[in-house]
């Protein structure tokens, strides 16, 4: 997808050096407040000051700022004068009253040559300008009225697959068997999930452990002690499989998990403990064994779109040749796609007074995490957000988007989810991927700091501070395996159930996990714990990353570390809403600085002045790094979370970090 004018070249390419390139150099860095102010995304109605430095003070040039969003505007840049022997040029622009992405670069004609300074070719739209690059810098303009629930930026999230968390009493674990389905019910809570492969390579996912909502309710005191304030459930509605992403009935809690009353009771008791509940909304497809499609005849011989072209649900689906040739999700016949823009479907899911999204928020939940949000039409997302906020302005809409959500390209179109009209925020896979790459020595600290700074630049603060900062999930091998360097991806799927980490692998994986954990609990957004990660659960990819929680068999050292990090974050507001800057003191040490200054936090709200610095060392060797007093709001003393005291000498701190260790220091 183009950014700005269709490029005549790409940054990173080896451009031919011309005379003007040798005699004149243009400089601009989006992350430098001198060059761009304000930093980050800008609200509608705002102003942005952009500056450009020309290395050759004698160069008689006329410079232009080119701004593009469907149409092009060119702004002349005025010379400000010399700074350190270099000429500074400036342009100030109003961003207008329409939420959108603006793209800009700098151009001039000099000695008969067309000179361009554009963005680096890493597709972030941020960073230090590159001579000759026609890729544009990104400027996010978001709705000034856009805000996200405060509990998102303050929260610690915990993801639960209900079948695998805890068995409670009072539900019918054999319900699906009574409906004639072929299911497997594990008697041994601690055994591995089964892999039952279909001809198309999918897992039938028909083995169950009997976890339910009552089991979650019984464990609320544990979750409170862990420091959790948001519970995110994988789908809980009636469905054939154990994962429930093949919805059978949006209006019915799966009887294996409980019923609507059990959910209401859980929400009420969680609220009393300061916890909220978010549900998983799967609205791009349904199950073939659903009330709406009924391929298997579970709901009657003549019910559902598959069995009756006159069904009220028929228009929800796209049949190429009825009944067996229909559009389905990623080719899986068990997951027929829905037409989200069908009027009846929209009314049912979104618009009716008791629509699906409205009903479950009315029943006490605090919003939705949207499965495959980037496969849902933008008008559908806008209406979904409007309906949810109409029921409760404090409810959240969180999307599954795996890339930079400000300029995600899906199905050939660029989509921006950060403008304030669709999602509150997204799952922060870019952060997860960057930290894994750093800890596994695939990228150095400087590269990762730039990636994370670019996200912070592209995202509005309400969006950035509401991110779901996950380490593990049901879609990836357990984080312990990933960081141990042995996720089983090199062995046949049929052999992964018996795959175990060696003692040495487990030890180094645990050390890296604790580094990642510390960093996740130090940056903006909701840190999210995937159930069992805090207990040291290991496992390869699906279904083995979906093992049961090991009650009574937890890794106590890992559990203690998770509790400590949650307590640290919950006890220091600066780690929730302080300003944020990423640093790379050396290639093996990555850091983040959080600050409240002048009595305000990042949102301009009243807050005590505070500063915190988190550093993580991926090297096996001790590393000494240096911080200036200016880095930490002028503080002369830092105290780490483990009680070490650091005193500035000649305006600088010398900090020793042991191999594969990290620390968080607070200014005193």
What do the PLM-derived regions correspond to, one by one?
Residues 163, 411-412, 425, 468-501, ...:
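Aromatic/acidic polysaccharide-binding cleft in carbohydrate-active enzymes
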Residues 2-154, 158-159:
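Glycan-association/targeting regions that enable binding to alpha-glucans and other polysaccharides
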Residues 52, 160, 223, 233, ...:
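Conserved, mostly hydrophobic/aromatic
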């Amino acid at each position: 997808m183009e950014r700005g004018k269709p490029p005549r070249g790409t940054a990173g390419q080896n451009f031919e050096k011309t005379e003007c390139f040798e005699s004149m150099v243009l400089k601009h860095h989006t992350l430098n407040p001198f060059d761009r102010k304000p930093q980050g995304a800008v609200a509608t109605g705002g102003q942005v000051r952009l500056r450009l430095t020309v290395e050759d003070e004698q160069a008689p040039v006329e410079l232009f700022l080119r701004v593009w969003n469907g149409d092009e505007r060119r702004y002349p840049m005025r010379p400000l004068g010399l700074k350190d022997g270099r000429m500074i040029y400036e342009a100030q622009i109003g961003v207008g009253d329409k939420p959108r992405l603006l793209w800009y670069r700098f151009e001039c004609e000099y000695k008969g040559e067309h000179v361009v300074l554009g963005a680096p070719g890493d597709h972030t739209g941020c960073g230090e300008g590159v001579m000759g690059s026609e890729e544009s810098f990104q400027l996010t303009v978001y709705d000034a009225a856009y805000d996200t629930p405060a509990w998102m930026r303050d929260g610690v999230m915990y993801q639960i697959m209900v079948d695998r968390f805890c068995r409670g009493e009072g539900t019918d674990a054999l319900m699906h068997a009574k409906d004639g389905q072929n299911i497997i019910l594990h008697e041994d809570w601690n055994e591995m999930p089964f892999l039952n492969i279909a001809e198309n390579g999918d897992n039938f996912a028909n083995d169950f452990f009997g976890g339910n909502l009552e089991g979650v309710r019984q464990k609320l005191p544990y979750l409170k002690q862990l420091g959790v304030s948001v519970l995110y459930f994988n789908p809980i509605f009636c469905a054939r499989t154990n994962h429930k992403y093949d919805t059978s009935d949006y209006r019915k809690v799966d009887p294996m998990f409980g019923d609507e009353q059990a959910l209401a009771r859980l929400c009420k008791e969680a609220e009393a403990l300061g916890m909220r509940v978010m549900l998983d909304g799967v609205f791009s497809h349904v199950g073939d064994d659903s009330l709406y499609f009924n391929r298997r005849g579970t709901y009657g011989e003549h019910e559902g779109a598959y069995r009756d072209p006159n069904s009220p649900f028929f228009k929800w689906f796209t049949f190429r040749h009825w009944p067996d040739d229909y559009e389905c999700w990623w080719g899986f016949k068990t997951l027929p796609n829905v037409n989200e823009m069908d009027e009846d479907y929209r009314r049912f899911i979104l618009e009716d007074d008791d629509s699906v999204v409205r009903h479950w928020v009315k029943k006490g939940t605090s919003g939705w995490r949207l499965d495959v949000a980037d496969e849902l039409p933008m008008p559908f997302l806008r209406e979904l957000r409007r309906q949810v906020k109409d029921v409760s302005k404090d409810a959240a809409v969180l999307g599954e988007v795996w890339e930079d959500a400000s300029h995600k390209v899906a199905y050939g179109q660029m989509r921006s989810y950060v403008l304030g009209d669709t999602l509150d925020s997204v799952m922060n896979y870019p952060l997860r991927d960057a930290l894994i790459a750093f800890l596994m020595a695939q990228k150095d600290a400087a590269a990762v700091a730039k990636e994370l700074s670019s996200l912070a630049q592209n995202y509005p603060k309400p969006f950035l501070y509401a991110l779901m900062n996950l380490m593990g999930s049901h879609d990836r091998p357990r984080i312990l395996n990933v960081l141990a360097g042995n996720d089983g991806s090199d062995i046949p799927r049929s052999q992964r159930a018996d795959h175990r980490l060696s003692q040495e692998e487990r030890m180094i994986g645990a050390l890296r996990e604790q580094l990642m954990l510390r960093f996740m609990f130090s940056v903006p957004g909701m840190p999210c714990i995937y159930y069992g990660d805090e207990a040291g659960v290991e496992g390869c990819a699906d279904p083995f990353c979906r093992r049961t929680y090991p009650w009574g068999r937890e890794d106590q050292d890992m559990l203690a570390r998770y509790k400590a990090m949650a307590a640290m974050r919950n006890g220091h507001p600066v780690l929730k809403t302080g300003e944020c800057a990423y640093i790379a003191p050396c290639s093996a040490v990555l850091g983040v600085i959080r600050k409240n200054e002048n009595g305000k936090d990042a949102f301009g709200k009243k807050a005590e002045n505070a500063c915190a610095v988190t550093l993580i060392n991926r090297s096996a060797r001790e590393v000494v790094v240096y911080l200036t007093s200016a880095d930490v709001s002028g503080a002369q003393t830092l105290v780490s979370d483990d009680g070490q005291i650091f005193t500035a000498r000649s305006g600088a701190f010398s900090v020793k970090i042991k191999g594969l260790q990290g620390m968080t220091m607070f200014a005193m």
